[in-house]
Amino acid sequence: MTQNTEPQSPAHTRVIVGMSGGVDSSVAAWLLKDQGYQVEGLFMKNWDEDDGTEYCTAMTDLADAQAVADAIGIKLHTASFAAEYWDRVFEHFLSEYSAGRTPNPDILCNKEVKFRAFLDYAVTLGADYIATGHYTRQRPLNDGSGKAQLLKGLDPNKDQSYFLHAVSGERIARTLFPVGELEKPEVRRIAEEQGFVTHDKKDSTGICFIGERKFTDFLKQYLPAQPGNIETPDGTVIGKHQGLMYHTIGQRQGLGIGGLAEFGDEPWYVAEKDLKRNVLIAVQGKHHPLLFSRGLVSGPVDWVAGEPPAQKFRCKAKTRYRQPDQDCEVTVIDGGVKVVFDDAQRAVTPGQSVVFYQGEVCLGGGVIEQTWRDNEALPARLEHQASEGSDT
């Protein structure tokens, strides 16, 4: 898929905008049309609603997207990527939860559906580029590689580069991000000024296929409960859980272990999952040492540029969305990276992603597999590599 990463004149450039029925993609489409591009919209259906529930909002979202397309004066296509979503995203989502990890399906959805299935389909419709309403930016490399850098959005409160880190530089180069140059209040102002029905629409939260449902209720439809004990680090049983998959590291709510007089009033937090024993380890106090990790090991890393900047380098990282950038040292190892943070990090969660930055440039990221604390032995995987490296 070779393509000049610098758009030709807008009048000769055809862009298909992924329109979700939300305010951000509405304004993205309007901005491009206002700039003179040949613009069409496409509404993606990524989840099969025929599951007997009332929680999906696809029909309402489609109606809103159509109303905005009509207001702008552009054609709106519709396409179903539900099969791709199930095969490439949802089955992995269930597999990770059943293994006791906490995945982020939005990241995989962007990689496999929004910037793969959608982009490939848009090309068949004659698109030169796609566009989305993500708060991020891209910068063509202009080095003949056909790639672009992924940059943070200008609005620090809305920057979504964390969720797009797994998209390749080639596909980033084929995408325009009009609202990445704006702050959210300005986007809403434009939508209201244009009379879009989406101007005051609530931002979507959570995972698209769950909607407003309680997460545990949704998960129970697909994964059977596996009850077990909740214990303190010294092995004292203080409660029961219905399944490790329903809990995440650092979680406070939903443990059902309040009112234990002998332990005082400090709240309890999930510190660890003992997968072999099916035990949830809980500690008291938001700043308990067992909630903090000095480092982590990731699985394979998706580098936006296709390769890491070096075998060992310093940069900043996030282990969750909207976390302030954290200083760290990254070492490339077999099958992933080792990350050592300058400051211990709270509630680093296997299954979530660690994403790397140098300035405004998002380098890429990978899924967190293991963590270790201060004064704790390195994971065996790292000890093995360290012993091999000591001979050099």
From Swiss-Prot:
**Recorded E.C. number(s)?**
2.8.1.13
Q: Does the keyword Nucleotide-binding apply?
A: yes
Which GO biological process categories is it annotated with? tRNA wobble position uridine thiolation
Q: InterPro entries recorded for this chain?
A: MnmA-like (IPR004506), MnmA-like_C (IPR046885), MnmA-like_central (IPR046884), MnmA-like_central_sf (IPR023382), Rossmann-like_a/b/a_fold (IPR014729)
User: CDD domains in the record, alphabetically?
Assistant: MnmA_TRMU-like
Q: Name one Pfam family in it.
A: tRNA_Me_trans
Cellular component, GO annotation: cytoplasm
What is catalyzed by this enzyme? S-sulfanyl-L-cysteinyl-[protein] + uridine(34) in tRNA + AH2 + ATP = 2-thiouridine(34) in tRNA + L-cysteinyl-[protein] + A + AMP + diphosphate + H(+)
Residues recorded as binding ATP, renumbered to this chain, are G18, M19, S20, G21, G22, V23, D24, S25, M44, G133
Site Interaction with tRNA: give positions.
Answer: H134, Q352
The segments labelled Interaction with tRNA in the record are: 158-160, 320-321
- Its chief place of residence is cytoplasm
Q: What class of enzyme is it?
A: transferase
Residues annotated as the enzyme's active site: C109, C208
* Keyword vocabulary terms for this entry: ATP-binding, Cytoplasm, Disulfide bond, Nucleotide-binding, RNA-binding, Transferase, tRNA processing, tRNA-binding
Spell out the disulfide connections: C109-C208
Q: Name one GO molecular function term.
A: tRNA-uridine 2-sulfurtransferase activity
Q: Which family does it belong to?
A: Belongs to the MnmA/TRMU family.
Q: What does this protein do?
A: Catalyzes the 2-thiolation of uridine at the wobble position (U34) of tRNA, leading to the formation of s(2)U34.
Name of protein: tRNA-specific 2-thiouridylase MnmA
Q: Say which species the protein is native to.
A: Marinobacter nauticus (strain ATCC 700491 / DSM 11845 / VT8) (Marinobacter aquaeolei)
